[in-house]
Swiss-Prot record:
SUPFAM superfamilies: Fibronectin type III (SSF49265)
Protein name, entry field: Soluble interferon gamma receptor OPG193
Sugar attachment sites: N42, N150
Induction of synthesis: Expressed in the early phase of the viral replicative cycle.
Originating gene: OPG193
Cleavable signal peptide: 1-17
């Protein structure tokens, strides 16, 4: 009688076995499934075009499980199957290249004597102990990102937006040089072109306050030239002796006129 009761309990449990929730997510090709359900399950995966199921986990309870390396890194669909006794359920995914999300890039600012370098490090996938940048790799869906950087100078509340050209990028990241004497804060976001339509979150903001050994003034139009002339005139007065001031002031005047003429032609 005791054995009959035990068998009955097992039979009842198998009837009520059910996956109550399921979620697949892949960030930078770090792929995980999260699920809830009663009892222990065998979990396997099958890629489109392949007949056999690959066993990933055996007799495991609900939770979050890493399945990186099992789905193909391409556009083919795949299925995840849960089995407990006679109970089976299959979850469908449209394909890793479609589903994968790309995390934010990393922004690095480095000051040099006459300029500041902005380096945008590509998001990367982790394989074992290796970090592999996500940039035009066939085994990562040929994904590459075009970056937009927001520069905030000094006390300005409005950032200056700049689109990074892919010609400024290598397999590790993108690099541009600029100059400023003001504190600058930079954040960057990446986006793909084409039908994949992947957009990263904005990176953490990185700030740098340069040393005052280079004097610059932004000129966007001829209306900015007087401000440039006044600023450089103050530098000449405060940093050079009277003999040098005379020559430099004349040079500043002729340079300002040349810049104004050039900008007028562009207008």
């Amino acid at each position: 009688m005791r054995y009959i009761i035990i068998l009955a309990v097992l039979f009842i449990n198998s009837i009520h076995a059910k996956i109550t929730s399921y979620k697949f997510e892949s960030v930078n090709f770090d792929s995980k499934i999260e699920w809830t359900g009663d009892g222990l399950y065998n979990i396997s995966l099958k890629n489109y075009g392949i007949k056999t199921w690959q066993t990933m986990y055996t007799n495991v309870p609900e939770g979050t499980y890493d399945i990186s390396g099992f789905p193909k890194n391409d556009f083919v669909s795949f299925w995840v199957k849960f089995e407990q006794g006679d109970y089976k359920v299959e979850e469908y995914c449209t394909g890793l290249c479609v589903e994968v999300k790309i995390g934010p890039p990393t922004v690095i600012l480095t000051e040099y004597d006459d300029h500041i370098n902005l380096f945008i490090e590509h998001p990367y996938a982790t394989r074992g102990s290796k970090k592999i940048p996500i940039y035009k790799r066939g085994d990562m869906c040929d994904i590459y990102l075009l970056y937009t950087a927001n520069f905030t100078f000094g006390d300005s509340e409005e950032p200056v937006t700049y689109d990074i050209d892919d010609y400024d990028c290598t397999s590790t990241g993108c690099s541009i040089d600029f100059a400023t004497t003001e504190k600058v804060c930079v954040t960057a976001q990446g986006a793909t072109e084409g039908f994949l339509e992947k957009i990263t979150p904005w990176s953490s903001e990185v700030c740098l306050t340069p040393k005052k050994n280079v004097y610059t003034c932004a000129i966007r139009s001829k209306e900015d030239v007087p401000n440039f002339k006044d600023k450089i005139a103050r530098v000449i007065t405060r940093k050079f002796n009277k003999q040098s001031q005379s020559y430099l002031t004349k040079f500043l005047g002729s340079t300002s006129n040349d810049v104004t003429t050039f900008l007028s032609i562009l207008d």
